[in-house]
């Protein structure tokens, strides 16, 4: 995130075949929203998501912004996530901005507590913080990886070893289609 804002979002469609998925599955993935607002209360974004008729919505992080000067829309973003759950179940993992806000609690003036408390009350929102959920109808496991900030350094890259990943998430389920929500800010 370099502070540049896009006034438009882009819809990209991919088709995948995985024989472990029991029936057709439509996923909407929204990442790096960075508190951007598309129309009043993000109605343009929500309408576009609804038009796609997803079975689930995946949010692999950076929905909010941790910079103090740009946090004014955190509540709008949280409300957008709440409205997404009216379209389909939402699976959310943290990115570097959520992690940054969480780790800098003393500097946030209660911003993280307010945001996370609001999210906790949302029905059909599944927070995946180094955890996974099995979704029976499709035979899919959705994993959410929450990396420490050390993995987000831009100049000194810290490799993520497989044993570290396994210690954080456990072993992948070989009989299921496994989906990993992991944020990479580059």
What are these regions, as identified by a protein language model?
Residues 3, 40, 93-94, 134, ...:
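Intrinsically disordered, low-complexity regions enriched in small/polar residues
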Residues 1, 87-89, 144:
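Glycine-centered flexibility motif
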Residues 1-28, 34-35:
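Acidic, histidine-bearing metal-coordination/catalytic regions of metal-dependent phosphoesterases
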Residues 20, 33-35, 98-186:
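Conserved catalytic scaffold of divalent metal-dependent phosphoesterases
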Residues 8, 40-41, 160-163:
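Short secondary-structure boundary/capping elements
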